[in-house]
Each structure stands twice: as structure tokens, then as C-alpha cells.
Amino acid sequence: MEIKLEQLGYCYQKNSPFEKRALLDVNVSFDSGSYSAIIGHTGSGKSTLLQHLNALLMPTEGKITVGDREIVAGVKQKKLRDLRKKVGIVFQFPEAQLFEETVEKDICFGPMNFGVSEEDAKLRAKKVIYEVGLTEEILSRSPFELSGGQMRRVAIAGVLAMDPEVLVLDEPTAGLDPHGREEIMEMFYNLHKEKGLTTVLVTHSMEDAARYAEKIVLMKAGTVLQIGTPREVFAKPDELVDLGLSVPDVVRFQGLFERKFDVKLTKTCLTIDELTTEMAPYLAKGGA
């Protein structure tokens, strides 16, 4: 499912003394089946943009098109349930939203709230519990008896049970250790590929943006500064650092190497293998 934002703007408490501009003239599209990342410093508008993707927030200027549904600023919208069923959002610390007596009931809550029968919802729960790396026996347990990592997977299963066409991830690995983060990100990537999802990742991790995204949207103060491939965006690491952002370790090491040997590699490397190949000729002759 394709998503397109055109001249999108948003103000909190518009036309009041407390009006605050959050987004301004945002123009970006997310192709069907693509994996995109949105990066930017805290307060850049990432999460506000994210909440427009399933109409949790409505634009105050411009429009957003999700599939065949168009949402235009100032136009009253009806039947948003269908849109919200197609766009699943995994927020930071999603486990905080667990509340039911059992894991099964928690996973079934969303689908049943959108009109799925209890029987079909239970079938979905049995399917998605495996998709998040857990087993069926956990369905009868209380979610509050589980480990933190298991609780997060259960919460993610609840989103997947809605059978979304678009998956929006808002810092989905917040609070996890490096191993847990890698497991969760690999899980999302596999789901993205297997289901043909349109995936939008909001992240502070430049490593994840470089590793998984096909396209990166760089934001500052509610506006889009750059849209490009990871290689294009990370080709100017100093500009990212000036914005208060980090860069992937491989990109940082490439910069150190180029300065030390006074050379310029042929491309911005995103993996260790790429960097090793690019460095090899210089290392073989002991530098430039």
C-alpha cells in the first residue's frame, strides 16, 4: 500500500494562544512494499508525522493519501476504522499497553474491536504468536508473568493480528539490549519481506536506518531536509553530526581512514565488507 504526503502541515492547538507548529510543507511518498526510515533529532517532527499515517492526527494543511483513501486538511473524515485497520503502529514500549487477563485475549482485542469474530481472532492469535518468535503455549498465560522481551513480542503480535498492509515502527527497540534490539529488528525485516508490507521506521539508530531502509527521510524542525538512499544520506556525515545525529560506525571509521591516509574512497560504505574491499588497495601498499 502506497502512502503519499503532499504539502502536509500540522499545528498543535491551531488558532489558539498556544499554537505550535509541528510540521510544515512535508512532501514525501512511501512506495508499496518499501522499507523507509525517518530520522532526525528530538523535536524534528518524526513522531507527529508518524501519527498522520493512520489518522491519529489529522493534517491542518495539505493532504495525505493512504492507498485509495485521501485525507485533506479541513475536510471531515468518516469511517477511519478501515484505514486504521490497514496501518498498524508499534509505539515505543508497546508492552505498556497490555491489559488483558491472558496473552490470547490481549492479541484478540484489536481484531475483535474491528469486527473480526472471536473464533477468527483466536486463529489469528495462534498464527502471529509464532511470527513474533513465541509459542502457542504462552497464549493461556498472563502477559504480566512474562519477561520484558516476551511482553514486547506479545504487544507486537497484537498489532500483527490486525493483518495490516502498512507497519509503522516508532523506536520499536527502545530499552532493549543490543542482542534484543537485533532480534526484534530482524523479526520486523523478515515480516516485511514475507508479507510484502510497506514499512516505515522512526529511529534514532543510524545503524538500523543504514542496515534495513531503502530510503531515508531526514527531518529538522518539522520540515524535510533530505530524502535519499542510505548511501546518499550518509555521504555527508558532518552535516548529520551538526544536526545532533550520529552516523553508522562503518561511515565514521571510513572518515577516519580517509583523513589518516588523505584519500577518498569511491563510495560511502555501509557494511564492513564494503569498507574492507574499498580499503584493501591502500592497505596493500601501506597507504596512498
From Swiss-Prot:
Keywords: ATP-binding, Cell membrane, Membrane, Nucleotide-binding, Translocase, Transport. It is a peripheral membrane protein. ATP binds at G40, H41, T42, G43, S44, G45, K46, S47. It is found in: Cell membrane. SMART domains: AAA. GO terms for molecular function: ATP binding; ATP hydrolysis activity; ATPase-coupled transmembrane transporter activity; cobalt ion transmembrane transporter activity. Its EC number is 7.-.-.-. InterPro entries: AAA+_ATPase, ABC_transporter-like_ATP-bd, ABC_transporter-like_CS, ABC_transpr_CbiO/EcfA_su, ECF_ABC_transporter_ATP-bd, EcfA2, P-loop_NTPase. Residues 3-246 form the ABC transporter domain. GO terms for cellular component: ATP-binding cassette (ABC) transporter complex. GO terms for biological process: cobalt ion transport. Coiled coil: none annotated. NCBIfam families: ECF_ATPase_2, PRK13634.1. ATP-binding (A) component of a common energy-coupling factor (ECF) ABC-transporter complex. Unlike classic ABC transporters this ECF transporter provides the energy necessary to transport a number of different substrates. Belongs to the ABC transporter superfamily. Energy-coupling factor EcfA family. Forms a stable energy-coupling factor (ECF) transporter complex composed of 2 membrane-embedded substrate-binding proteins (S component), 2 ATP-binding proteins (A component) and 2 transmembrane proteins (T component). This is Energy-coupling factor transporter ATP-binding protein EcfA2. It comes from Listeria monocytogenes serotype 4b (strain F2365).
